[in-house]
């Protein structure tokens, strides 16, 4: 499988001698599709049927869902909850976006969960985004401002100027 195009609306792949358009985005989805195609081949399924089914695949809700507004602003929703997942999402966006497009990341960490990933998530977001907004994300029994403070520790000094904190998630998304 070869990636011919990778854009916010999907992937154009070359699979053997066929071109395949899917509504999925990013190298990681191309790898997943390669695994699907290979497994189908091993199971003896017809290539044409496998390609037809693959072309109908859609994102899982909350995983790299993209929306394009009437004013051509692309919004991507991904509930990445680990540092590696966030890094993959932001690297995928950066590989697709043009240099004049701004990447604004809104990120939060859940309460009563692994505290060690909070500074890592903030470090990754601030290193790979044009602007970052730290916000509350289901704080459970914890103080949301304390969670955000623990995230901010991970921001390197040269990236701090492009970050801000808005505790209210709805306001942060606006």
Predicted region positions:
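Nucleotide phosphate-binding/pyrophosphate-handling subdomain across enzymes
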Residues: 8, 16-131, 153
């Amino acid at each position: 499988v070869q990636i011919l195009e990778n854009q916010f609306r999907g992937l154009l792949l070359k699979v053997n001698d066929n071109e395949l358009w899917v509504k999925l985005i990013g190298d990681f989805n191309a790898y997943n599709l390669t695994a699907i195609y290979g497994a189908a081949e091993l199971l003896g399924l017809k290539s044409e049927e496998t390609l037809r089914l693959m072309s109908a695949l859609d994102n899982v809700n909350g995983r790299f869902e993209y929306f394009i507004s009437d004013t051509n602003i692309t919004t991507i929703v991904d509930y990445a909850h680990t540092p590696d997942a966030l890094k993959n999402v932001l690297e995928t966006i950066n590989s697709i976006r043009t240099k004049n497009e701004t990447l604004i990341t809104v990120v939060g960490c859940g309460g009563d969960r692994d505290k060690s990933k909070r500074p890592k998530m903030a470090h990754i977001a601030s290193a790979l985004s044009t602007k970052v907004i730290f916000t509350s994300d289901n704080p459970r029994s914890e103080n949301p401002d304390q969670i955000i403070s623990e995230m901010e520790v991970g921001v390197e000094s040269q990236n701090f100027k492009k970050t801000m904190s808005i505790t209210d998630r709805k306001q942060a998304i606006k």
